[in-house]
Each structure stands twice: as structure tokens, then as C-alpha cells.
């Protein structure tokens, strides 16, 4: 018998984290729904990056529970963390694009690195993603040639 999938892909329950005596997160609880784009917003220094590093397994919570697809992130081994990270996407405030790659190649990069897809399949997927974010016509441009808003859309497509 298979257990039903939780509607939450990521769940934090009563999570606490800090550096020495400095508390960064105290008793934080929330969930990220499966298949949804979710924004994490807050004041500067409020712990947003720390939360993302906890979810990605770079940090370990001092208290509470953090699960990704039902698995305790703190108990994952290296291979399980890599597998989980391949299923995550993070969009940074300034795009984090490779400055020496075109828009097309920035979007193609993770497909080339993490899949065995043919170049023709990668091309089709990249063009579909660029179309979805309204940037198909910008495929040959370099990051220095596009606006900040366009760079964020390229990062989203990636």
C-alpha cells in the first residue's frame, strides 16, 4: 500500500537556528506546496538566506524538523541531498547568470550538466522556457545586454 503524497514538498516545524548566542530563527513553522512557485521575502538580515541554506542541507537546524518530500533533510546523506537539490530551483534577487554565456546558454546550462538529453531536445526545451517567460527573442543576447527584469526572467527559465 502506497501512502498518499503530502501537498507540501517542504515543511518546517518549530525550526530554530543560530550562531553561538545569536538566534537567527526561533520556532519557525511553514510549508511550501508541491508544484508551486513560492517567494520568501523579509527584511534584510531576517534569515531568508539561512532558511534556504537549511532547506538545501547546507546548514543543520538546532531544533525542530525540516522535511523535503517527506524526508528529514538533517538525516539525508550526500547522495540524497544532491538528488533533492536537483529537484529544487532558487531564483536569486539579481539573477545569478553566467556573464560569459548567452541567454540561451544560461538556460541550457543545467540541462547540459544534469541530464543526458540530446542537444536538439535541449534546444527545444530552452526555446519553450524562453517563450514561457517572454524572452525567445533575447536568446542570443549576453547578460550585460539585458535589463535586470529580463535577467530575473532568464534565471526563472533556467
PLM features per residue range, with description:
Residues 100, 142-146, 150:
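Conserved ABC ATPase signature
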Residues 41-43:
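The feature captures the beta-strand-to-loop junction immediately N-terminal to the Walker
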Residues 64-72:
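Conserved ABC transporter NBD signature motif
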Residues 71-72, 115, 119-138:
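Conserved ABC ATPase "signature" region
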Residues 100-110:
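Short coil-to-helix segment of the ABC ATPase nucleotide-binding domain corresponding to the Q-loop/switch region
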Residues 73-89, 113, 119-120:
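ABC ATPase NBD coupling module
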Residues 56:
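Helix-to-loop junction immediately C-terminal to a conserved catalytic motif
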